């Protein structure tokens, strides 16, 4: 059995299928772990949802910011973004089944054999592993409750930007969602910065650092595999592996086989 991790798909299904073919992926014995954002600007968001759902227990996927946005659009909370190609999902005959399945996906997944934790954007530098797991479960429970639409209606803000165990209600949930699905940079005191999307090398001040490079970041017992930040282009270090390498932007898709540490890449197919 082999375990493969792949960065953001964003509807680029053909590239994913080519990678799976190259490694002779066997859904009967192998596992595919996906860092979230199954949908968005790529040409086959609908087909990607169908494919990953069809893999059943052979696929582990988590929620990314684009996945949550899709759920919000489905409830009339948001609109389809101009460059997204997700509109066919809402008119598909299996739309309700796909969206319900997506809503049941977690924010965090742990691979206990390899001491790996997978999230979409990372783990707040103000959390240890038990806190991260607990926080993920809190929001996952709300998404599965009758308050899930309320949660999506109120998630679109950048505050609070710092963790406090006394946070409650929507402020607590909003911080958790932002940390797991939107985070890139932090201020030196650990506050999340939700505005800057530049590559780290383009930051010309000492006030922002990537979340995983914060000096006083709480130590984690697991290595973090995440996607979301294509500008990192596969950064490995600081006990993290960044797997989004910008396939949807014309770069390439990256697959990591954890069993032997081997990487596989697939250049983006011109659309």
UniProtKB/Swiss-Prot annotation:
Pfam families: Metallophos. It comes from the Bacteria. CDD domains: MPP_ApaH (cd07422). It is an enzyme of class 3 (hydrolase). NCBIfam families: apaH (TIGR00668), PRK00166.1 (NF001204). Hydrolyzes diadenosine 5',5'''-P1,P4-tetraphosphate to yield ADP. This is Bis(5'-nucleosyl)-tetraphosphatase, symmetrical. It comes from Aliivibrio fischeri (strain MJ11).
